[in-house]
A protein has these predicted regions:
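Catalytic core of membrane glycerolipid acyltransferases/transacylases, capturing the structured
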Residues: 123-182, 209-218
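A conditional alpha-helix N-cap/helix-loop micro-motif detector
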Residues: 106-110, 132, 159, 181-182, ...
Length: 319
């Protein structure tokens, strides 16, 4: 499923209608002024999330386990602030429709982007991002480096309608190709070129499938499994890796920078690059915890479950 550019032939007629209705709604919201987006609309969505107590038990459990040093009032304050973030993410997603550099170039400010482009001119590199702030803004990088091929690696959605909708929302530029995670290596091997830089963008903080060789790191006070795909690619092809560090300036406005965690040539121990990513992510989450995706059941797998299923555990990767 490597970037079929919104091939509606895969959908039934009623799914096509649903897709176009949703796209029309997104286009409508994308043309609203900021005071309406982040005033009335975001406030309404935030109210709905709070009234529905959206994934409240999961959020509170994750926060309590991650920050045992915080009291209950502080935990609940972060939860309410997270609902604000989630409402903003929904608004920002709706408003991605029809995005252009002229209209939306100010949404994400990249620090030292020109120096970064020059430093990696003619060299492929990996951007390891996370579900922090509004991660759907990160492909806006493609507007700054128009000569590069941007691979947006993602997990396909179960709903074909929303799969097509999100692919359309993310097609922000001709040099963006959305690649299903299972097709990453195949697509990269087919399209890598000495004539052009290829940027692999990966959201790397999801919970991986539990396997016998799943490795654990100390992260936010808990044993946590991490996806190792970026590290394997980097070591196989000698590609540098950059952690995407972000901060929110105000609703709908972010600043991001690239922090190198592997230069493509350093001799490192197994799992070391993934460990550096986990450490950088934890430091960022602790600075503004309300910006991370706490409603995801991130710790559904444990070393104990690994031992139960496979008879052994690679507990903590000797971290």
């Amino acid at each position: 499923m490597a970037d079929k550019r919104d091939n509606k032939g895969e959908l039934r007629w009623h799914q096509r209608i649903a897709l176009e209705l949703l796209w029309g709604i997104c286009l409508l919201f994308s043309r609203t002024p900021e005071w309406l987006r982040f005033g009335l609309l975001q406030s309404f969505i935030r109210l709905v999330l709070r009234l529905l107590r959206y994934r409240r038990k999961v959020i509170l459990k994750n926060l309590r386990c991650s920050f045992p040093e915080k009291n209950e009032a502080e935990i609940r304050s972060i939860m309410l602030a997270y609902y604000d973030t989630l409402a903003e993410v929904i608004v920002d997603t709706l408003c991605l429709a029809g995005a252009t550099p002229e209209r939306d170039g100010v949404l994400l400010e990249w620090e030292n982007y020109q120096e970064h482009i020059e430093a990696n001119r003619g060299r492929d590199w990996i951007a390891m991002a996370s579900h922090y702030g509004f991660w759907e803004y990160y492909p806006l990088w493609s507007w700054l480096d128009k000569d590069a091929l941007f691979m947006g690696v993602y997990h396909p959605l179960r709903s074909p309608v929303f799969e097509h909708l999100y692919r359309r929302l993310r097609n922000l530029a001709p040099n963006i190709h959305q690649v299903a995670m299972a097709d990453t290596l195949r697509f990269y091997m087919r399209h890598r070129s000495k004539e052009r830089t290829t940027v692999l963008g990966l959201i790397s903080d999801q919970s991986p499938a539990l396997r016998a060789d799943t490795v654990w790191f100390d992260f936010l006070n808990q044993k946590t499994a991490f996806i190792e795909g970026s590290e394997r690619l980097a070591l196989k092809f000698s590609i540098p890796i950059y952690f995407v560090e972000a901060e929110r300036l105000k609703p709908g406005r972010y600043r991001a920078r690239f922090k190198q965690i592997y230069d493509g040539v350093e001799q490192v121990e197994p799992k070391e690059i993934t460990r550096r990513y986990a450490e950088a992510l934890e430091a960022m989450v602790r600075r503004q915890p309300e910006l991370w995706m706490w409603s995801h059941n991130r710790w559904k797998h444990t070393p104990e479950k690994q031992r139960e299923w496979y008879g052994a555990s690679t507990d903590d990767a000797q971290a």
